[in-house]
């Protein structure tokens, strides 16, 4: 996870990683509720509360990194290359979570090379080339754009 959401603390357990994520929170009851919410979103993490992060798969570490960010009840979540190096089932899980978070009122900004998956969960999309925005539109319009289809969606 050298590029993703941030490294997890590999020598810490899942539970410790989540608690560290909300270290600045003074409301311990809210922290407990938020950690339980993370376990509801990612049941696999709940099953592995005492497991060291270093023994988890890349997808599980990605879930843990997202979960750690969620312990602070963010209004905005920035995610970079959520699908990089993950098994297809984990990619689907991560994008479903992103979609659900957005439906629950969290703004999620995703930087992602998997344009097909990203545009399926996005409200809006931007195409960058050499660091410059070359296309900007609703996700639906971008999915229907011939240039986007040919260059990024494999049409």
Language-model segments: what does each one mean?
Residues 11-19:
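Short coil-to-helix segment of the ABC ATPase nucleotide-binding domain corresponding to the Q-loop/switch region
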Residues 52-56, 60:
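Conserved ABC ATPase signature
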Residues 69-70:
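ABC ATPase C-loop
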Residues 73:
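Conserved catalytic motifs of ABC-family nucleotide-binding domains
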Residues 1-9:
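Single conserved hydrophobic/aromatic residue that forms the stacking wall/gate
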Residues 124, 136:
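Short, glycine/charged-rich "phosphate-handling" switch motifs in NTP-dependent
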Residues 91-104:
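Helical segment within the ABC ATPase nucleotide-binding domain
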